[in-house]
Structures are given as structure tokens and as C-alpha cells.
Amino acid sequence: MEADGAGEQMRPLLTRGPDEEAVVDLGKTSSTVNTKFEKEELESHRAVYVGVHVPFSKESRRRHKHRGHKHHHRRRKDKDSDKEDGRESPSYDTPSQRVQFILGTEDDDEEHIPHDLFTEMDELCYRDGEEYEWKETARWLKFEEDVEDGGDRWSKPYVATLSLHSLFELRSCILNGTVMLDMRASTLDEIADMVLDNMIASGQLDDSIRENVREALLKRHHHQNEKRFTSRIPLVRSFADIGILASPQSAPGNLDNSKSGEMKGNGSGGSRENSTVDFSKVDMNFMRKIPTGAEASNVLVGEVDFLERPIIAFVRLAPAVLLSGLTEVPVPTRFLFLLLGPAGKAPQYHEIGRSIATLMTDEIFHDVAYKAKDRNDLLSGIDEFLDQVTVLPPGEWDPSIRIEPPKSVPSQEKRKIPVFPNGSAAMSVGPPKEDDHHAGPELQRTGRLFGGLILDIKRKAPFFLSDFKDALSLQCLASILFLYCACMSPVITFGGLLGEATEGRISAIESLFGASLTGIAYSLFAGQPLTILGSTGPVLVFEKILFKFCRDYHLSYLSLRTSIGLWTSFLCIVLVATDASSLVCYITRFTEEAFAALICIIFIYEALEKLFHLGEIYAFNMHNNLDELTSYTCVCAEPSNPSNETLELWKRKNITAYSVSWGNLTVSECKTFHGMFVGSACGPHGPYVPDVLFWCVVLFFTTFFLSSFLKQFKTKGYFPTKVRSTISDFAVFLTIVIMVAIDYLVGIPSPKLHVPEKFEPTDPSRGWIISPLGDNPWWTLLIAAVPALLCTILIFMDQQITAVIINRKEHKLKFIPMPVLYGVFLYMGVSSLKGIQFFDRIKLFGMPAKHQPDLIYLRYVPLWKVHVFTVVQLTCLVLLWVIKASAAAVVFPMMVLALVFVRKLMDLCFTKRELSWLDDLMPESKKKKEDDKKKKEKEEAERMLQDDEDTVHLPFERGSLLQIPVKTLKYSIDPSVVNISDEMAKTAQWKALSMNTENAKVTRPNTSPEKPVSVTINFEDEPSKKYMDAETSL
């Protein structure tokens, strides 16, 4: 929009009569007192620009609080627009720094403590022949929600996009309108009367139309959540008759769900029956989303036919007041913004209302609005907001497009921290720092025996009880059920494999008992209770090698295994005593992702492998002839060439080949007697059973896809949020229940998980307690330390961070089909791949550059180096898989440790900055860190000492002494340093909006108790006999 058009459009917002006072915004206004000082009074002083050094940092704020707000008043430096020397505002007096000063003040009163805000915008709507009413059109909690045109529904929350012109118009409204801060009122009647009195006194409103405006303000409010059929009856009574519930902390933003329905305030409140709040019209689902202690900000905009120019008011109540019916939810109102204007400009007023509502949701302006002392503070907040906004080109973006809210909102803390004198920001966005990776005290070596364990106990003790109480939630129950089903199957499956490898020495019941003990003990007493210790593939390989060694050298396997277990316990205690966990800081993302990717691939591979294994057990005929199906048979027959094992079995059972009726045996009996299956319908392990295999395939993939669908159900548009969240949390458990029920109803005999029925050792000839020596020689007790060292590394490196609670006596898992559990394995593996950056980088190989996603590391690292990093990581992953799948699996932990050294070698190929984006930085030497820290502290001390020396002391009121740093208070000669308040006043758009105030010469008197005073001091420079002016704002 051009300047002339903008001024013409907004002229009604700024029009004043000839006898009215005008506020001229020239960046800053000041009351200047020119004082001539005698020569001897300023002897030996050079010409300096004197100003108040504003404290911004946290330390300065503490010092400000210590001095007390009663006698330490804020002083602002105001400069005249008619600068004789043409200099701009000093860099320390930008809107950003003024806002930082405002936020740095710490008032002792509780009335100005910022609360969460719920903002609602109502527009005055009317039709010919019908009365006015305020209708809710939008609301803001975190993001904007609009009432859809033509529909009785709310839009999805979206990021509000504002036009720069509407923000300029809003600033003009605050500049020229009525601003009343800390108004004490209890009803909307009182608020309206005080606002109208102020408007009439300032000439903004004519007294003849006062009653019309007042009547419009007190019209009823229609909220979106009210039923359509009730819109024809009065929704609320007149605000003059409505009681209030006022308290600085009243209506905490959440309703008490008890039957009494009490509203808890600060000693005041009423029951649901006695309160004027109509609870039947409160949207309880939305009310739950409002934080406790929240307050309301009401924006009222509209057009009427009795006004010739707009009237504007910004009101802050102190304390906040609950005005029933004004807001759709019963929270106390803190802020009111009113904009009423002549008919024909409703869209313009609507955009101004959206602008102030969006500003109230901004973290910085929100705090400024609470702590503002006068109109200038609010203008500084708007200017700081304008200084931070991002402008989208009009030809490249459609403002009607609604932007989805981001997953995480960026922090605004950097807007609260000032820029250093050298121009560098206090907080800058950059690559992750070195200290961010494994920087917690948990991984720092203490240098004392069991020092880390003692610190862990101290850290965990305060939360030990809450760990149990926090588990009493629906999400924890979902995790328990999921992990129970996911972890019990591997334990029992591993036990079966272990039984085969050790010829029944250790089998399923021992694995189940061991997993239960370690899981419960570790969860109760470990520093991380969400870790489960379970057996893995390398452990199985270790057991196979150890059993083979014992069998070859005629040693007792269980006794030697007991000795190794005792040595392993001792070595683990040594690791704890020496704080060996601190070495984990050398395992960066490079190693973590390779190991995590390997686990995901193992889950996927084993799930598919077990499915193929079912195809071998339940084979099907791949050469069927449909015409000969009736002739297919499969019977049990005597083995033609019985083995020695078969003969030994017959002898032990006291049977002969002739005494058995082979043709009448069942499949299981035939396998028991080592019979042979004969016939065209027989496979390697018995008769063909095609329906079982194909049913297992259906169960397997249905479990996977159903788990994925239910897990993503939270983002679907069906059912209420709570229902969707519950379904998503219990996705895997619900999938297992559904698939078990389907399998039961179909009736196909799919293989089921086998759970031991009795709690007894696999070998009935031994007990639970094994002697570490047994029949072995004495030296085995010592030599067992060598394999124990390798076993310790295996256990230490194979921990998986997850959560599990194992209930050993539960046997309901026997009804779960094995393909369903295999499908769960597949889901666990595939779902875990999504959060690994390594796989995102693999996908970049097949993408052209223009189609690649906007990944943060692609902005700072060349693409070819990203590919090199990925290839190295992929090579290490392949080596891990090859070693794990081969006979050398016992050295698998060593390979994981070797990844650390591979990562260290990459420092030679990549710069530190590139690795900071692709990976975590390796820890440097401790000495280097200490040297850097000492050097930084020394420089800081020297800088502070220099600041103390270069200080001007001026006598102040009441005998106080004003200390002013001189060197830090200089004019900015850097053209990149911009004061947006000054620059905005130069724009054609702002001049067009302010053109009607340029002719006004009378400045509105400053009624603020903290009236800024500016002293112009003339310094005489003796050598050059020249006079220089400097300005002090006190």
C-alpha cells in the first residue's frame, strides 16, 4: 500500500480537533533544561556524552533489587528529533535495550507478575432491525484459532501472520489512544465509565455520544461454544447486574472437577450454585488446556454508525477481575483493548485486533505489558517486536495460507539478553558446543573410590519414591504391557537356543529366572531404572564356545560358568569403583548411531528369519497337481535305516520295530519314536501344512501394519484427543489382543509361545545352587578371570536402554501366536529407524540437491563431505554385522570400542566445525579447558576493573551519587546498528499515518510520576576554546 493511500485509510484513527492535545511521536520526547555550568565547576573535564548506564544482566538485576524500587527510579534518556549534529540514537538506547531494562526490573508487588494469557477477540456485530451483540471471532492460547466463516466450528490452531501495515496502525493506536494502566475496577460498568471519562477529558470522545458508546460496550457477548438454539435469548445479563469474583490470583485457569464446583481464589470464592459463572456454558475440554493461574486479555473491535472517528483504549486491570460472560472461559481479565470506529472499515479494525492479540501471545511483549509503567513502555515493546519480525515478500506468499504450528517453539531468551559492547550477541545460534555432549556431572570422573556411585545415590535418593508414584499412569501401563510382551519372548526364545547349545544345562526356565532377578534388581537400585539387562547374540556365542571348551577338556560346564560369573561380578564392581562410566563420553553420535542401527537391523532380520524358519517347519508342496489332490497321502512308517540314537531310544522304552503299529501313529507319536513319513503329501518334517504357514504370514504382516497404524492414530482426525492418545499409547498391546482374538476365532493351529509350566531346573538331577569348583581342578578358579573379562565387556556394551517389568508367574503369553510376536519385533526395528540421522543421510544418496530436505547440517557442511561421513559410518556398520554373524562374534564389543578410534581418525579429514554439525565433538584435554577458563576469567576481571576506573560521578537528588561509565556510553558510528524507533519515524508509511499530527505543536503533558528530566551540559575545552554539548537523562 502506498504512503498516500495508507494515510488516507488510517486518517480517522488519528484525527483530532483543533482544541485537542496531540502526542507527537518523534522517537522519544523529552523535557529539556538547559543549564550553564561555570568553568571552575567542570575543570579538568573533557567533553563527554553522559547517560545512565542501564543494567541488563542477571547480576545487574539482582543489584537493582538490592537497592530497592522505592528510591531507585528508572530514568530514560530522551532526545529531541531536531538534532543539530544529525546523530542517531546511541546504540545503548534501542527499543530492544529499553525492553531489556523493563524486563530487568523486579517489582516487589505481586500485581505485575506475568501470568499465562488467554486472549479472546470479540467483534461488534449487528444487522438492520436487530440489536448489537459482541460475537467471538478468534482466540489465542498459544496459537490463533478462528471461527470459520459460515460454520459453527473452530479452525485448527495456526501461526498468526500479520501485515506490517496493521502493526503500524496498532502502534499509532497505542500512541494516540487512551492508555490506562493499573486500573482498579470490579465491574465492566466501572471500567467503561473510567475509560469514557478519560476519553472525554482528553478530547478523544464527544460527551454527546457517551451513552451510545457505553451502551455498545455493555452489549451481550455471544461465544462460539454456546448452542445455536440459545442465540435468540439473552446469553448473559447486563454487565451492570453481573457479580464478579476478583482476586490477584483468582480463577486459577482450571476448574475444580469436584462435585462442589468451588472456584479457589486467594481467600475468596464461591460455590457453583452461588457463583454468577454459568458453568453449563463453559467448554470444559478447552478449559483443561488453559494453564493454572492464567489470566485473560480481551480484544473488543467493531464498527458503529454514531462515530465519526475511531476511539481506542488499552486498559490493564490491577488486580485481575473475573467478569462473567465477557470471556468464554471463567478466567480473570487482566487486559482490555477497545477499538470502535465508523462503519465501513471492519476488516481494518479486525486486523488491528489480531495484531494486538498476537502481540499479547508474544513472550517478550507479554512481559512488557505486565511491567509497563507508561505508554512509552508499551511503544518500546511494539518497536522491539517490529525489530524481530520476519517479512515475507507479498509476491511470494499468500497471507491466507495458514501455517501449521511448529513442533517446538524457539526460545526467546536471546531477546532478553543485551548485545555486548563489541557488537557480539550474548546468545548466538550456532553449532552445538563441545560441552553440550555428555556434559552432565554423571559422566565426570570424581577421582575418589566409588565417588560416582555415591553421587548417583545422592542424586537418586530424592526421586526414589516418586519413581514409583509416577509409574501410576496410563502411559506407563501401556509401556509395561508392551515391554512385557516384547521382552518375554526373546528371553524364552534365547533360553531354548541356550538349551540346545548347552545340551540342557541351561535352558528357558533359567533364562526366565535370571532375567526376572536382574530386571527387578537393576530397576530398583540402578541409577537408570529404565534399563533392562538381557541376553544377546554375542552372549549366546560366548556360551557355545565355553561349552565346547568344557566338553573338549572334560570340565564341568556349570561349575566353570559359576566361576566366570563370580569373576564378572568382581570386575563390574571394579568398573563402578573406578568411575569407568566416564569413558562413555568418548562414544559420540557416530558410534551410537552405528550401534542403534545394528540393533534395528537385528530386530528386522531376526523377525524375517523366524518367519522363514516357520516355512521349514510347516512346509507346503510347491509342485501340487490339483487333479491328484485326492490321491495325496502321508503316513508314518518304520525307519529303513535306524540310527544308533533311535536304537538306544527303542531300547530305553523297551519296544521293538515290529511291536509298533506305525501306520496308526499320529504325527507327534511318529516323531517321538523317530519314525519316517512316507507319501506324496509329506515334507522333510512331516505332512505338508500350507494353511498354517500362510496364516502365520497374515498374522505377521497384519501385526506390523496394525501396530504402525494404531501408533500414528494420535495424529488422525477421528475421536476426541484423549481417546486417540490412549489408542496410540496402547498400540502394540491392542494389536496383540486383536490378533490373538482373531487367531482364536479362525482356529488355525498356529504355533504358540511355549512357557515353562513348573519352576524347577531344566536338569532335575541338580539344584539351583552350583559349586564354583565342582569336579574341576583348582586352577580353573583363577583361569576363569580371562573369559570373565570378555564376558564383562559383553555385558557392559550390550545394555539396551528401555523399560521392562517382568512378572515371572504370568502364563497368559502361551496364547499368543509366535507370528504375532515376530511382527512386534519387525515393528520395533522399523519404528526405531525413524529417529536415526544416519538413515536420513543414506537417503540423500538418491536425491538430487534441489529435492533434498532442509536439514540443518546441509547448510554448513558440503554435500560430498556428508556423503564421505555416511560411507565411513556405513562401512563400520557392515563390519559390525559381519562380525556378529560370524564365528568371531565374541569380539563384537571390541569392534564397538574400535568405532571410537575410527571416529577419532576422522578429525584428520573434517574440520571441528563440520564435525560439530554431523557428530558430537570429542572431549579435549582437561588441562586445555582449565587454561581457557582461567584466561577468560582474567580478561573479564580486567574489563570490569577498567570499567570501574572510567566512571563519572555526578551528584543526584537527595544527596545520592550517580556513577556513570563513560567509555561504554558513546554514539554508535556503526551503520549496521539501527534504532527501529528512529528508522520507523522516517518511513513514508509512518509519516502518512502521522500526517495529521504534524501540525500539532502542543505536547500532551506528561503525567507520569517518573517524569524524565534531561539536562544539557556545556563543556568548555580549554586548549581549543570550543564548546561541546552533552545530554544527560536523569
Curated annotation (Swiss-Prot):
* Disulphide bridges: 634-636, 670-682
PTM annotation (Phosphoserine): residues: 57, 60, 89, 155, 238, 250, 268, 271, 275, 424, 960, 1033
Drop me one GO molecular function for this one.
sodium:bicarbonate symporter activity
Q: What happens when the gene is disrupted?
A: Deafness and blindness due to degeneration of sensory receptors in internal ear and retina. Mice show impaired hearing and reduced locomotor activity and rearing/grooming behaviors. Show defects in the mucosal protective responses to luminal acid, both in the pH recovery of enterocytes after luminal acid exposure and in the acid-induced HCO3(-) secretory defect in the duodenum. Knockdown in mesenteric small arteries leads to a dramatic decrease in the Na(+)-dependent base influx and in steady-state pH.
Transmembrane stretches in the record are 477-497, 506-526, 564-584, 594-614, 686-706, 730-750, 777-797, 813-833, 877-897
Q: Which residues are glycosylated?
A: 176, 274, 644, 654, 664
- Biological process terms in GO annotation: auditory receptor cell development; camera-type eye photoreceptor cell differentiation; cochlear nucleus development; locomotory exploration behavior; regulation of intracellular pH; retina vasculature morphogenesis in camera-type eye; retinal cell programmed cell death; sensory perception of sound
Membrane-side (Extracellular) residue stretches = 1-476, 527-563, 615-685, 751-776, 834-876
Name under which the protein is recorded:
Sodium bicarbonate cotransporter 3
